[in-house]
Amino acid sequence: MKKTIKTLALFLLCLMCLILQASCSSDEEITDADANTELVKEATNYLNGEIVLRTNATMNGVNKTLLPEGCPTKFKFEWSKTDAQTFTISLLDFTVGNMGMIINFKCDVKTMVLNSWEQKEYTGDGWIKFKGEYGSVWGTDTDGSASSAKGSSVQGYYNAKTHEIQFIVNYNMMNVRSECFKQTIDKSRLATFDADKAKYEADLAAYKKEHGIK
C-alpha cells in the first residue's frame, strides 16, 4: 500500500513538472508572437517622431535624476518601412544632473503580445510589448574621451488606446539605464521641451544645494 502511494505521489509530481514546463514553453512562444496588427497600426499613427517623456537615469543603481518627477527626455520613434512590427528608438546627446557623461543610443525593437504574467500587470485593452537587443551606444565622458558599446537593450509596453507607455533602456555602458516610468504621452511637451529641461536643471541645482550634493 505504501509503495502504491509513493508511486502515485511520484507520478503526480512528474505530471505537475511536465504541465509547468509546457505552460512556460507555451508562454514563451506567445511572447515571441507578433502583436495584434490593428494595435500596431494605431501605434504607428501616434508613437512616432520625437516624443518627450519623463525618465529616471540610473548609474550603478543610483538615481542620477534625483527629482521624483524625472527628467524631460526626448526620444525618437521611427517605424520600419519593410517590417510593420518593427521600429527604432533613438536618443541623442542625453545627459542629466551629475551623470558626467553624454550618451547617444539607437536600437531596433520588435512589437509582440504580452505573456500571461504581463497581462496581469498591464490590464485592459490596447497593450503591446516591444523588445530590442543589440542596440548601439556611443558617448563622451567628462574628460572628453569617447566611449562606445554594443549590446544595449530595450523592453517596454505601450497602450495603443490610451497612449500610456513604460520602458527601460539598458545602455550596457558604465551600468547606466534610462527608466521611463508608466505615463501617458503628451505630444504638446515637445514644444516646451527646452523650457522644461531648463526648469528641471534649475530645480535639480536647488535640490542639490539644499541637500549638500555636489
Regions found by a protein language model. Give the residues of each.
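Tubular lipid-binding modules of the TULIP superfamily
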Residues: 34-70, 78-82
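Polybasic, proline/glycine-rich intrinsically disordered low-complexity segments
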Residues: 123-171, 176-191
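Hydrophobic lipid-interacting interfaces of membrane-associated proteins
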Residues: 56-58, 92-98, 135, 170-176
